[in-house]
Amino acid sequence: MRDNIIIITGITASGKSELCDNLIKKYGNISIVNCDSKQVYKEIPIITAQPPKQEEFYRLYGCVPAKENYSVGLWLEDLKGEVDHALENARMPIITGGSGLYISSLINSLSPIPKVSEEIRKNVSELRKNLSKEEFYKLVLSKDSKIQGKISTNDLHRLSRALEVITATGKSIFVWQESRQLPLFDNFKIYTILPKREDVYRKINSRFVTMIESGAVDEVKKLLNMNLAPHLPAMRAHGVPEIIKYLKGKITLSEAIQIAQTNTRHYAKRQYTWFKNQFPNSEVIDCANKLIEFEIF
């Protein structure tokens, strides 16, 4: 267990990366530990907006091959190692990122769900792809009645996870979630960055254009040439599916940009709702760099 852990989270394009750069300038002896489920993949630094390679300050960024199915359980193991390493070297760890499941598992502890086999994941992915939303929901409901009223028809990610778990273990994911381990840390301080929506949406639009100009298309082309399974997390990073459609000649680049921007804005909208409801004890900040004025340690 560790005390006084700082967590900086918030929606996508809220200014977390710029804030971290400024915190490094202010404090120096800190380690920024990644808490973004897509920024761990080393083949997609542009499309996931990873910070520059500065291993002295930034940890768990671009460290996992895209062919891997990195999980929250593996992240918690790696996180503990990075926090221990930072404290042993007189550096203060700051955990930052916008992956809600990662943050939630860190604070509330993780359910001890056994690992799901790659074969089951592929089978569920195929079912999700070949069935309509309504058909997929009915299928999952027929296997796990506990999802009723807890997972919506549109939440395909959570539906897929529920089907994977009950197929692999014979028990509902909600049964597993009732049995939790001890949290990793005793005390933590959470800062949640939630700027004005119009500012975030504008940043999302401009950031994706910058990604394209910085080589995101070539980056995704190399990823596509790896012939990875479409259900892998790296293949589902924001912007990747849209660029793949462009590379396959299904849509124009302009359409890919527009669709990716729209999908990311919709994701940000869902994040707003999620973060407002999940962490009642966090300190909400409407501008990331306001945190520079605080003494967070």
From Swiss-Prot:
Monomer. Pfam families: IPPT. The gene is miaA. Gene3D superfamilies: 1.10.20.140, P-loop containing nucleotide triphosphate hydrolases. This is tRNA dimethylallyltransferase. Signal peptide: none annotated. One of its GO terms (biological process) is tRNA modification. It catalyses: adenosine(37) in tRNA + dimethylallyl diphosphate = N(6)-dimethylallyladenosine(37) in tRNA + diphosphate. ATP binds at G10, I11, T12, A13, S14, G15, K16, S17. It comes from the Bacteria. Its cofactor is Mg(2+). The keyword Nucleotide-binding applies. The record marks S99, R121 as: Interaction with substrate tRNA. Residues 36-39 are annotated as: Interaction with substrate tRNA. Belongs to the IPP transferase family. Its EC number is 2.5.1.75. It comes from Wolbachia sp. subsp. Brugia malayi (strain TRS). Keywords: ATP-binding, Magnesium, Nucleotide-binding, Transferase, tRNA processing. Catalyzes the transfer of a dimethylallyl group onto the adenine at position 37 in tRNAs that read codons beginning with uridine, leading to the formation of N6-(dimethylallyl)adenosine (i(6)A). Substrate binds at T12, A13, S14, G15, K16, S17.
